[in-house]
Regions:
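Exposed loop/turn and edge beta-strand positions of beta-sandwich/beta-sheet ligand-binding modules
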Residues: 1, 32, 45, 64, ...
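Basic, Lys/Arg- and aromatic-enriched nucleic-acid-binding interface segment
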Residues: 1-15, 19, 32-33, 65
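Short basic/aromatic active-site micro-motif
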Residues: 1-2, 76-77, 93-113
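C-terminal catalytic core of tyrosine-transesterase DNA break-rejoin enzymes
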Residues: 6, 10, 16-17, 102-126, ...
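Conserved tyrosine-mediated DNA breakage-rejoining catalytic core shared by Y-recombinases
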Residues: 11, 20-58
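Catalytic-site neighborhood detector that most strongly recognizes the C-terminal catalytic loop/helix
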Residues: 40-44, 123-148
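C-terminal catalytic core of Y-nucleophile DNA break-rejoin enzymes
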Residues: 40-85
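C-terminal secondary-structure termini that scaffold catalytic or DNA-interacting sites
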Residues: 150-153
């Protein structure tokens, strides 16, 4: 679960897409580096998602093409409890679900300067409006940051 959650933070993939991910969908080319070619569970859209070397290396030893990349990944209350305990150990008190990894990816991409159109495509969103939700989070952070500096005038 931990490895899959970190992979989601590094790729923005939904739980359902990570759960069904097969080794045959993991690709590499000189042009794109590591990438995943898959059909999204939610939208049924065909996607090509570039991933970082760090995300790829997290996967460990490559299995057979038909093998799942995360063979023991199931959605259950006990798995969510595992995730909760892991967060508590890390000092994170906020309620975290697996979907938070996707939010983390989007927010980090925007915070690090990736334009919203690219983030939208990386997430496989059909409409830019969907991605705008994450941009609003960044706008709130900018407002908070701007108000941190106060020289007492």
């Amino acid at each position: 679960m931990k490895r899959a959650f970190i992979f989601a933070c590094l790729t923005g993939l939904r739980f359902s897409d990570i759960q069904k991910l097969k080794w045959s969908e993991m690709q590499q080319s000189t042009e794109l580096g590591h990438y995943i070619r898959f059909v999204q569970q939610k939208t049924k859209g065909s996607e090509t998602l570039p991933i970082s070397d760090e995300a790829y290396n997290l996967l460990g030893e490559k299995g057979k093409p038909t093998d799942p990349v995360f063979p023991d990944l199931i959605y259950s209350d006990s798995r969510n409890a595992d995730l909760y305990r892991w967060m508590i150990k890390a000092g994170i008190e906020k309620h975290i679900t697996f979907h938070c990894a996707r939010h983390t990816y989007a927010t980090l991409q925007l915070t690090l300067g990736t334009d919203i159109f690219t983030v939208s495509k990386l997430l496989g969103h059909r409409h830019l409006k969907t991605t705008q939700i994450y941009a609003n989070v960044i706008d709130e952070k900018k407002t908070v940051a701007a108000n941190k500096i106060n020289i007492g005038l």
